[in-house]
């Protein structure tokens, strides 16, 4: 049975872990790192890069290097947050045919689900390389405050990557699992999760293997990216004052500023000052310009003070919803890279009136929790019960555009709730059920999840028909809704899909495209390997001909030289099968040279039977060890 892996699909970095020997283990990627940058790039020559290689070339390829894509997943193009992202991204965010926010690639437009799928594929391959077996199932984490559309989009990304997503789990809940699995006694904990693009806070009661989420709150557009942008704005502003040049119109300069802003932010967690030094940042008629600005920790903290304060309001709401006071919280667990910032730690300490717990790795704890949940689903982890909640209220639009809640926020999931409604007009033959999610009083102010029609209602005065609407939320927090006419028994049911979102056909096309790309990538790698093997064999054989060519007839020598020329010609092309065939032909021809060398050595030694054991034999073996590369 294949292992169920746990993946933290982060805004800035992603991480994969698996249960092994009763412990969750974070798996290192091919570059030897325990986290992988959530960056995807398309190069000019058609290569697709993922992770650190993509990040490294971002400065020279800003138009087609995609980062922080998680902030767009499940969002429409017209969403204010997507528009905000569009204004500050060096790559192009475009409107898809379904109204969603997509990104413009070199050859086509990509959905955030596809870009996320490339990152998930990298995580999947990382796990497969470590485990030595195929991986098909995963638990993937999302911010607790993700709505239904964002959760569904994340699940779709998993499918495109070839993964069956067994469970979508909230990031703070996953962190609590990792923190509390081996803790004894009953505790009420707060998980403060400030990551690269999102902020969540969850309150949980843990004890005896039961993890019960009491409340959750957050902001899906607040994270490290916003802190970076404040530094970028500051640096660009200072440079404009000094040089009169606006760097924000220069994509290359903007990308360099962003990279340096991120470095400054990290350094200022331990240092009190950071020197931003970017030579040749731009040029004008007078020549090249250099940027050199000193940024102190105090200045950085003043730039982001309001962002840190924005995390406190959700903390207050989460406490209120759970009916708790800060004094009733036994432990505050910090999650996410931004919690390394001293000002963030101080704000948490001040609000909860206690030192936050720093005993978990904020970059890895979420993936570890996801792996533990995978272990629970696989049966490897016993006696653990996880009771999560829905982060936002769910309901429908009723007469006058009012939002009528059926399921209140922070309701334990999975859950099911029904309520009876009626018609607004006499002899109304159908009703449209408009489903929304949020906390505003008017339906139009909340997130519209979708709509469907219940038709064939028997003619009757308004208010008489009884339409039973049922909401069902599964353990992933994904919603399905049904409406039933109690008089006729007619029923209509849908799993909510946002007005945008990917259709089943879209997902299948993207899955096929991903598989096709995987085949193309494999073929490209095989071609490169074939060329490398060919060059090695050509070099070795030419060397042997120079040293031992006199030991064979001119005919044999001519055959070998022709085989070398044929392989050189094949290696200059792009046909891996042709290269392999010519490679084999040269090996066959070169064997005659090898036989002649052995025969000559035997004659020199005067001991025919012992000649193969001569000291020089090692050299000959090494020269023709290329035989193994046919395997």
UniProtKB/Swiss-Prot annotation:
Any GO MF annotation of the entry: ATP-dependent protein folding chaperone
Residues carrying Phosphothreonine: 198
Source organism superkingdom: Bacteria
Keywords, ordered alphabetically: ATP-binding, Chaperone, Nucleotide-binding, Phosphoprotein, Stress response
Disordered as annotated region, ranges: 603-631
UniProt key word RNA-binding: no
SUPFAM superfamilies per UniProt: Actin-like ATPase domain, Heat shock protein 70kD (HSP70), C-terminal subdomain, Heat shock protein 70kD (HSP70), peptide-binding domain
Transmembrane segment boundaries: none
InterPro entries: ATPase_NBD (IPR043129), Chaperone_DnaK (IPR012725), Heat_shock_70_CS (IPR018181), HSP70_C_sf (IPR029048), HSP70_peptide-bd_sf (IPR029047), Hsp_70_fam (IPR013126)
Inducers of expression: By stress conditions e.g. heat shock.
Acidic residues bias (residue ranges): 618-631
Chain's role: Acts as a chaperone.
Family designation: Belongs to the heat shock protein 70 family.
Alphabetical list of NCBIfam families matching this protein: PRK00290.1, PRK05183.1, prok_dnaK
Protein name: Chaperone protein DnaK
Organism the protein comes from: Hyphomonas neptunium (strain ATCC 15444)
């Amino acid at each position: 049975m294949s292992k169920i892996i746990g993946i933290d699909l982060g805004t800035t970095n992603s991480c994969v872990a698996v249960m092994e020997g009763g412990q969750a283990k974070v798996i290192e990627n091919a570059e030897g790192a325990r986290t992988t940058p959530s960056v995807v790039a398309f190069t000019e020559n058609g290569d697709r890069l993922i992770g650190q290689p993509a990040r490294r070339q971002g400065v020279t390829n800003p138009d087609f290097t995609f980062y922080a894509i998680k902030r767009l997943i499940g969002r429409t193009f017209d969403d204010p947050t997507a528009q905000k992202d569009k204004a500050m991204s060096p790559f192009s965010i475009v409107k898809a045919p379904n109204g969603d926010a997509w990104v413009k690639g070199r050859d086509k437009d990509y959905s955030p689900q596809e870009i996320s799928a490339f990152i998930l594929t990298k995580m999947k391959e990382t796990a497969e390389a470590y485990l030595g077996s195929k991986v098909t199932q995963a638990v993937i984490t999302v911010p607790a405050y993700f709505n239904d559309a964002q959760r569904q989009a994340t699940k779709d990304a998993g499918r495109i990557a070839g993964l069956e997503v067994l469970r979508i789990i909230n990031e703070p809940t996953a962190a609590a699992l990792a923190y509390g699995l081996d803790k004894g006694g009953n505790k009420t904990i707060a998980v403060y999760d400030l990551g690269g693009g999102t902020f969540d806070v969850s309150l949980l009661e843990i004890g005896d293997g039961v993890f019960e989420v009491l409340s959750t709150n957050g902001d899906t557009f607040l994270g490290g990216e916003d802190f970076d942008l404040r530094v970028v704005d500051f640096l660009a502003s200072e440079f404009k004052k000094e040089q009169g040049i606006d760097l924000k119109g220069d994509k290359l300069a903007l990308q360099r500023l962003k990279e340096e802003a991120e470095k400054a932010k990290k350094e200022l967690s331990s240092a009190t000052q950071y020197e931003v030094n970017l030579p040749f940042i731009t040029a004008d008629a007078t020549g090249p310009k250099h940027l050199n600005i000193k940024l102190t920790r105090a200045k950085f903290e003043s730039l982001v003070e309001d962002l840190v304060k924005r995390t406190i309001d959700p903390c207050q709401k989460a406490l209120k919803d759970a009916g708790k006071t800060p004094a009733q919280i036994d432990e505050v667990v910090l999650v996410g890279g931004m919690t390394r910032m001293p000002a963030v730690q101080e704000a948490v300490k001040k609000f909860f009136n206690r030192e936050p717990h720093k005993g978990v790795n904020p970059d890895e704890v979420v993936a570890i929790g996801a792996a533990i949940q995978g272990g629970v689903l696989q049966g490897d982890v016993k006696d653990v019960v996880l009771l999560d909640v829905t982060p936002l209220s769910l309901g429908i639009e009723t007469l006058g555009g009012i939002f009528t809640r059926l399921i209140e926020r922070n309701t334990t999931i999975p859950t099911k709730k029904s309520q009876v409604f009626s018609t607004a007009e006499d002899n109304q033959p159908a009703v449209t059920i408009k489903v929304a999610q949020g906390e505003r009083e008017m339906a139009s102010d909340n997130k519209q999840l979708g709509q469907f029609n219940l038709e064939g209602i028997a003619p009757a005065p308004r208010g008489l028909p009884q339409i039973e609407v049922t909401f069902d939320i599964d353990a992933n927090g994904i919603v399905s809704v049904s409406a039933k006419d109690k008089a006729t028994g007619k029923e209509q049911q849908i799993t909510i899909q946002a007005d945008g979102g990917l259709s089943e056909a879209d997902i299948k096309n993207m899955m096929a495209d991903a598989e096709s790309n995987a085949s193309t990538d494999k073929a490209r790698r095989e071609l490169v390997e074939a060329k490398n093997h060919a060059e090695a064999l050509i070099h070795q054989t030419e060397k042997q001909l120079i040293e031992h060519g006199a030991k064979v007839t001119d005919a044999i020598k001519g055959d070998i030289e022709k085989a070398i020329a044929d392989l050189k010609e094949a290696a200059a092309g792009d046909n891996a099968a042709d290269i392999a065939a010519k490679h084999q032909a040269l090996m066959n021809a070169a064997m005659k040279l090898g036989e002649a060398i052995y025969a000559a050595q035997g004659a020199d030694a005067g001991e025919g039977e012992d000649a193969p054991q001569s000291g020089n034999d090692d050299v000959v073996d090494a020269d023709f060890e290329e035989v193994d590369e046919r395997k």
